[in-house]
Amino acid sequence: MRASGRHDVSLKIVLATGCLLLANFSGASSAVATECPDQSPELQPWSPGHNRDYQVHIGHGRKLLLTSSATVHSITISGGGKLVIKDHHEHIVLRTRYILIDDGGELHAGSALCPFEGNFSIVLYGRADENILPDPYYGLKYIGVDKGGTLELHGQKKLSWTFLNKTLHPGGMQEGGYFFERSWGHRGVIVHVIDAKLGTVVHSDRFDTYRSKKESERLVQYLNAVPDGRILSVAVNDEGSRNLDDTARKAMTKLGSKHFLHLGFRHPWSFITVKGNPSSSVEDHIEYHGHKGSAAARVFKLFQTEHGEHFNVSSSSEWVQDVEWTEWFDHDKVPQSKGGEKISDLRAAYPGKICNRPIDIQATTMDGVALSTEVVYKNGQDYRFACYTRGRACRSYRVRFLCGKPVRPKLTVSIDTNVNSTILSLVDNVRSWRPGDTLVVASTDYSMYQAEEFRVLPCKACTSTQVKVAGKPQYLHIGEEIDGVDMRAEVGLLTRNIVVMGEMEDRCYPYTNHICDFFDFDTFGGHIKFALGFKAAHLEGVELKYMGQQLVGQYPIHFHLAGDLDEQGGYDPPTYIRDLSIHHTFSRCITVHGSNGLLIKDVVGYNSLGHCFFTEDGPEERNTFDHCLGLLVKSGTLLPSDRDSRMCKVITEDSYPGYIPKPRQDCNAVSTFWMANPNNNLINCAAAGSEETGFWFIFHHVPTGPSVGMYSPGYSEHIPLGKFYNNRAHSNYRAGMIIDNGVKTTEASAKDKRPFLSIISARYSPHQDADPLKPREPAIIRHFTAYKNQDHGAWLRGGDVWLDSCRFADNGIGLTLASGGTFPYDDGSKQEIKNSLFVGESGNVGTEMMDNRIWGPGGLDHSGRTLPIGQNFPIRGIQFYDGPINIQNCTFRKFAALEGRHTSALAFRLNNAWQSCPHNNVTNIAFEDVPITSRVFFGEPGPWFNQLDMDGDKTSVFHDLDGSVSEYPGSYLTKDDNWLVRHPDCINVPDWRGAICSGRYAQMYIQAYKSSNLRMKIIKNDFPSHPLYLEGALTRSTHYQQYQPVITLQKGYTIHWDQTAPAELAIWLINFNKGDWIRVGLCYPRGTTFSILSDVHNRLLKQTSKTGTFVRTLQMDKVEQSYPGRSHYYWDEDSGLLFLKLKAQNEREKFAFCSMKGCERIKIKALLPRNAGISDCTATAYPRFTERAIVDVPMPRKLFGAQLKTKDHFLEVKMESSRQHFFHLRNDFAYIEVDGRRYPCSEDGIQIVVIDGSRGHVVSHGSFRNAILQGIPWQLFNYVAAIPDNSIVLMASKGRYITRGPWTRVLEKLGADKGLKLKEKMAFVGFKGSFRPIWVTLETEDHKAKIFQVVPIPVVRKKKL
């Protein structure tokens, strides 16, 4: 096939006339030669034959045209020499150990205007252990393009990759052809008439021969009217025999049926025949008795169209019995019985929940460890089973049963027009994909290993956007947008007509340490390397396979310290790599090393070891990765970041002796796109499966390797992000995208034993010109899609990192935005996401396979699906961490918790020791298919959350600016037991384990020097019985410890320690505005003396200036008085408390943690007496310094009615029962309030308000005097018995009510704990129904019982895991 360029030239020659033709002929020939390098008249034909010892040197201006396949030792092209590959029908294969191009040498196959149309392969051969001296720069088995060298490889123009446009189902079902399925409501004999020439359904009809004999007559008429030669598929659904007369039975027998004559009641029956050819018939018939179990009659037959293409017709007539597991039942009082346990006893204990005759049984210990079970006796209703652990009968365990559902009919008719083949429907025109080409279809599930290869087949019937491929898919590959997220599988082309490949051995051999410990195949492939000063390099339409070596520097394509590769470097046209297929590689795909301005476009990288698209040392900038696809990226041995856990532990030669690997910290980072400098462009790229991460922006504090000194320290951490637009990441383990971490830029040493380039901590803060003293320049991430990533959709740490119009779905955690555990690294910056969508569990349920990590129930419909990590892993949309974070105009869809799986749209980082910024905020949040109970979750002790006792776990908080999350505009949401931010009017949200509060909040950082193992106790003076204990954020090995509580401003606090107070500490005022203050009393031993000063510390400039001193006063009131440069402290030696008033003196930017002048601090040096004891002054501080709890910022009014965006909502419930004393008078006060409507209690006893749990309306209210409670409690029993199920029941006491007696049993019926003991005051939120909601609450105290909380409406029981 000739190039289009040649056709154009020929056409011009034909159209020319006379002298003009003759005059232009030589010019046209010159154009051909320019565009098609093999047409140059200066070329000499060259056919060197096959000689492995022939060392070819093409120089001194020789210009050769390779016309046939050849085998040589090596080829060196230099000194103006040129080698061009002839483009003709013969497949040319050039085998050589290496090709070196330098000093004006050139190698050409095709050109940009005249693509190579034939087939040309370069095969690089040789082993690493052949005792051949490697080139000191290029090594072995290479194409090297050195100074002055030119490499031009231009293959056919073919589409590089596209997307599926229709979903592929496992086994190819529903792909092409015809699919028909029915159940109830489609009774009778179902007939399909199929055109045998085309394999298409011509007509179909249903004949209800159960209902009427006339339907039998119509069936006979219908069959008689079908022309001979047509295919008939006939089957019964449900029942078709009751009014089936002999005429119809005989008509079917005439067609070839042997069983229709004897069709009985509800018998499954399927039949396929060709009209007029009874011998072609296939038939299946089952006599079905009873209503339990499954039965199926299935037939299929293979046919051939007039075009010679095969199609398969199949039919099944079935009775199907679905099964499901019951919930788990606790069985802690197991009777000892020789004959086993009777299931009837369990059914009596759990009425309506266990079937009579289970199909299977499972048992576990109370901790979830599987136990053995055995059915020991079945006879009628006497069904028994036994449970064993280590050969002995179980004493206490959990058990569940597999029960069959009622049977249902099912009829299926399908025509598979692609027998052992599949039609792929694609987005783009794929006419350039030819029969014999190989494609790869990416996984759209969590496992990257669900990527599948297919070979293209001829297909006359395919449209321009379809191809037929051999075989059937094993996995589900999505080809559509699901729940608003584009999850279409990428489809990449792997084969090209120009191939560069390594010749490989059958198995691994050791050419470097440990290589055969990790790989059983040969990994010593070929490689292409471009050095500084090459003349030109343009590769397109090329396939690279079996390339790369597990040696540093030997990669499939490697630009090595080549400098600027675009116009800035004098390259015209600029260097590019495009339309390449790089697959089955042994070390990366493309490496950009110390090179800038390279265009990498339309490249497919598949099945590689180590990072695929790789930037190496840190100074690589202005490179553009446009429309590149990487998938199936596996770990390699080269760098710590390439290695998996096993490699990390075994390969320790590059570490210092004594190094103990920590794989998840030091290694485990292999990524599809590894960006060592943010100033590169990624546009329209897809990271479709890596063992770790899709896109990882990593930071080199200084350049590494041979690039040392190319920028100043910290440059890469401050350079603005290049374009990051319309990229996607899925099927990765750790994350779809990460911006975080750095690499260790020093060699291993006794001080730091980790290997060079291990993963370490780093922070990103983009500024103009990479100068932190210049304005910030946010990193903008637009139109990013992340789905089916097992851990994170994205983990982004900044600096200003802003996301806009992004999509996240089916990730373990959709998004974590982080700044710094102590301070934001770039104070004044924020992380932000807006106009984005988060989906918890989409309609992409994945494929249930043996190798699926996790398969379990979904949250909304409880149907099976693949899950990201574990069945009980708490799936989260956005995870709050550090701050400040702004979430604006985002939609959360399909987040639904199960009992045992705490899924939520908004949540917090698990096991968090670090700070939580009170200025983290949300606004204009929308929820779709998210129960209100699953909007937020603050955590509880248990799996994944552990004890929930780390400092950050206890101080989590965020600001709901418009009430779109909580229904309380302007409120703050906090953990329910964080009394440093609570006030008396806060409203509990039991489902969230949180509370809705109002107030003005900031943070106080307390740094205790020369002591890292102190436990701090901080108490807010208005809630002295609710201290907060903080362990400190830092490890015990540090020289100081830091505590970071969120506090309410304008309040008083005391601070205590579990050991002797620290002799030196600093208190930082964080997120304080000018004039904000708190009063603090710090516990010290008696006899302590103090030196206290204040200063301002500029963290950016690392400058500190003293601003004042504190002098002692003997009057507590003087602590309130302060003057510029002079403040007071009060040392109350009786209580052991040092009192200070901490007040911010300077203005603060909106998102800054510290003031514009720096961080305001108070430093305390204490001279402690010897042998001082524990510094806990709680007993002497309270009640002396207790303050009355008041609400400084009133609670916002709850949104109602049309203000709410969802049908489910919160019902505000307030109840109080208290005793108040005014001098010698006593007043009992009680009320119940529902959504602002108050029901006062008028007499001693109890008052009840009943609320419809479906709509939230009060349906009744009443009171029961003490006389009734004590004398005739049956009135209360009857009242409660008459309350409809699914009702919320509120109850409050007033006065001296009766606290004991039979009436209290109603509390237990409404969800209160058994054996409760009531005190003088009681408030109760109960529920009448078949389950106990988490929000059932009983408060009972001697003086005051109070409940302020919300209840979700409608009340819905969570499904069990």
From Swiss-Prot:
Per the UniProt entry, the Enzyme Commission number(s) are 3.2.1.35
Ranges of residues in domain GG-type lectin: 176-317, 1227-1361
Would you kindly state one Gene Ontology biological process term found in this protein's UniProt entry?
hyaluronan metabolic process
Please give the catalytic activity noted in the UniProt record. Answer: Random hydrolysis of (1->4)-linkages between N-acetyl-beta-D-glucosamine and D-glucuronate residues in hyaluronate
The record's keywords, sorted A to Z, are: Cell membrane, Coated pit, Cytoplasm, Endoplasmic reticulum, Glycoprotein, Glycosidase, Hyaluronic acid, Hydrolase, Lectin, Membrane, Nucleus, Repeat, Secreted, Signal
Annotated region (Necessary for its endoplasmic reticulum (ER) retention and interaction with HSPA5), positions in chain: 295-591
InterPro entries per the record?
Answer: CEMIP/CEMIP2, CEMIP_beta-hel_dom, CEMIP_X, G8_domain, ILEI/PANDER_dom, Pectin_lyase_fold/virulence, TMEM2_PANDER-like, WxxW_domain
Q: Where is the signal peptide?
A: 1-30
Q: Where in the cell is it found?
A: Nucleus; Cytoplasm; Endoplasmic reticulum; Cell membrane
Q: Mark the PbH1 repeats by their residue spans.
A: 572-594, 595-617, 719-741, 798-819
Gene Ontology CC entries for this record:
clathrin-coated endocytic vesicle; clathrin-coated pit; clathrin-coated vesicle membrane; cytoplasm; endoplasmic reticulum; extracellular region; fibrillar center; nuclear membrane
Q: In which tissues is it expressed?
A: Expressed in Deiters' cells and various supporting cells in the organ of Corti including inner phalangeal, border, inner and outer pillar cells (at protein level). Weakly expressed in brain and testis. In ear, it is specifically expressed in inner ear. Expressed in Deiters' cells in the organ of Corti at P0 (postnatal day zero) before the onset of hearing, but disappears by day P7. Also expressed in fibrocytes of the spiral ligament and the spiral limbus through to P21, when the cochlea matures.
Which sites does the entry annotate for glycosylation?
119, 165, 312, 420, 889, 921
* The G8 domain, residue ranges: 44-166
Name the major location.
Answer: nucleus
Comment block on domains: The signal sequence is essential in mediating its proper translocation, hyaluronic acid (HA) degradation activity and secretion.
The UniProt function text for this chain reads: Mediates depolymerization of hyaluronic acid (HA) via the cell membrane-associated clathrin-coated pit endocytic pathway. Binds to hyaluronic acid. Hydrolyzes high molecular weight hyaluronic acid to produce an intermediate-sized product, a process that may occur through rapid vesicle endocytosis and recycling without intracytoplasmic accumulation or digestion in lysosomes. Involved in hyaluronan catabolism in the dermis of the skin and arthritic synovium. Positively regulates epithelial-mesenchymal transition (EMT), and hence tumor cell growth, invasion and cancer dissemination.
Its quaternary organisation is: Interacts with EPHA2 and ITPR3. Interacts with HSPA5/BIP; the interaction induces calcium leakage from the endoplasmic reticulum and cell migration. Interacts with clathrin heavy chain/CLTC.
* Record-stated family: Belongs to the CEMIP family.
The molecule here is called: Cell migration-inducing and hyaluronan-binding protein
Gene symbol of the encoding locus: Cemip
